[in-house]
């Protein structure tokens, strides 16, 4: 073994997946990944050239389906100068909203988790830990009533998701991946974790929003998946989020008014006495740190170097144009018409894939979210690939796992618990 190869073997950096075939010129890429000696030698004289997606040529869709399932699949297609046109794909199941289809487990379980407060269990089940205010809020309700669920029902609220673990309602499953789609609504991106829902057939839900799975949530937000994909920040902690809901709900019915007023006073007093401000979220603070707004409106935060401009570049198309293309695809009546629109959308996918390879991970994340938020079946395979790759490269592997499981079991409607519309 030559000295160069010995040095390569002992190099602690991550091995580049493309090895000797790597065409990457970005110095940041070579700092993070090691390459075989022969490539290393060749790379010294290379001039760094960043890809400019705006000097684009018209794309013509391939006649074959391309179904990238991983980061390798996406970037290999770019390496081979392939248009990687992605047409109708059977790899992602169609979203379901039937009651039977929404049920992922049977209701004959006799082994349940206890009322867990150990955050390791939450991490094991949901890939994220729960913040302190989550447990404090449960304490607040537990102090108020022996039946927390009845108390919440009196104000038209339902505790869902990780609260089922606190309530002792979560069954122990062999397939732990299914916990990742327990109460995950149709438009819930991996950053958004629902914890409360308006009772009944409403799809209005409130959840924690995290930019990074290993960080604390940055705010709680609301979404009504029966209407759209918009995620609207409402509060910094769950006390303020519930207070916001109660103030809005008490005006909806005279029968709700007294119960909502009573609980809102309790929540505000208990929250403030424990150091939680009961006030609406200041959206300007979010705008300052987000790299772009995204289709769902809550924005994304990724590392970005202003000097080198590495980390993010704008999408090749404006959001307005992307929405128009999505609408055309939804309205397309035949296979030929769909294929034509898909070929128009393809440059967005291809250029975002190239941006990923040049360390502009935020671009891949933004494009993947746009495809995800479209809710269009023909785009779901591309959405999964772009998002999985982006999260992995951003070292947010937990989010990559969540999106993969979600896309496999993506469901519409209000009954998105593991047990569907069955009452636990």
Question: Where on the chain are the PLM-derived regions?
Answer:
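Short secondary-structure junctions and interdomain/linker hinges
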Residues: 148, 202, 249-253, 274
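Cys/His Zn-binding finger modules involved in RNA regulation
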Residues: 1-86
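Charge-dense, low-complexity intrinsically disordered regions
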Residues: 252-424
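A surface-exposed partner-binding patch
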Residues: 69-209, 343, 355-424
């Amino acid at each position: 073994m030559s000295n160069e190869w010995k040095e390569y073997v002992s190099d602690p950096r991550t091995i580049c997946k493309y090895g000797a075939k790597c065409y990457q010129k970005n110095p940041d890429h070579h700092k993070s990944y090691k390459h075989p000696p022969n490539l290393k030698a060749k790379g010294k004289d290379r001039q760094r050239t960043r890809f400019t997606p705006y000097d684009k040529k018209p794309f013509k869709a391939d006649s074959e389906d391309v179904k990238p399932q991983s980061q390798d699949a996406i970037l290999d297609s770019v390496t081979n100068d392939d248009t990687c046109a992605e047409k109708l794909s059977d790899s992602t199941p169609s979203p379901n909203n039937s009651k039977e289809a929404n049920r992922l487990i049977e209701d004959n379980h006799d082994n349940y988790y206890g009322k867990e407060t150990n955050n390791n269990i939450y991490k094991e089940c949901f890939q994220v830990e729960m913040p302190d205010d989550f447990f404090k809020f449960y304490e607040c309700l537990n102090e108020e009533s022996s039946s927390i669920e009845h108390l919440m029902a009196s104000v038209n609220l339902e505790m869902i998701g990780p609260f089922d673990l606190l309530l002792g309602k979560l069954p122990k499953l062999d397939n732990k991946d299914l916990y990742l789609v327990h109460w995950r609504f149709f438009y819930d991106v991996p950053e958004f974790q629902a914890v409360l829902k308006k009772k009944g057939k409403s799809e209005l839900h409130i959840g924690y929003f995290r930019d990074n799975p290993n960080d604390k949530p940055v705010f709680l937000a609301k979404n009504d998946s029966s209407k759209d994909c918009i995620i609207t920040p409402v509060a910094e902690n769950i006390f303020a989020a519930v207070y916001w809901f109660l103030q809005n709900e008490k005006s909806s019915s005279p029968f709700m008014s007294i119960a909502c007023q009573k609980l809102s006073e309790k929540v505000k007093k208990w929250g403030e006495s424990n150091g939680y401000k009961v006030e609406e979220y200041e959206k300007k603070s979010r705008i300052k740190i987000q790299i772009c707004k995204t289709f769902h409106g809550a924005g994304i935060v990724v590392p970005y170097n202003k000097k080198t401009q590495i980390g993010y570049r704008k999408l090749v198309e404006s959001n307005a144009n992307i929405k128009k293309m999505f609408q055309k695809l939804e309205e397309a009546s035949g296979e030929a018409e769909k294929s034509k629109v898909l070929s128009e959308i393809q440059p967005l996918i291809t250029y975002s894939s190239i941006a990923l390879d040049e360390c502009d991970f935020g671009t891949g994340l933004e494009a993947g979210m746009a495809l995800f938020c479209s809710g269009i079946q023909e785009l779901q395979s591309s959405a999964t690939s772009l998002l999985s790759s982006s999260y992995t490269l951003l070292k947010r592997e937990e989010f990559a796992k969540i999106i993969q499981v979600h896309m496999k079991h993506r469901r519409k409607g209000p009954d998105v618990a593991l047990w569907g519309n069955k009452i636990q």
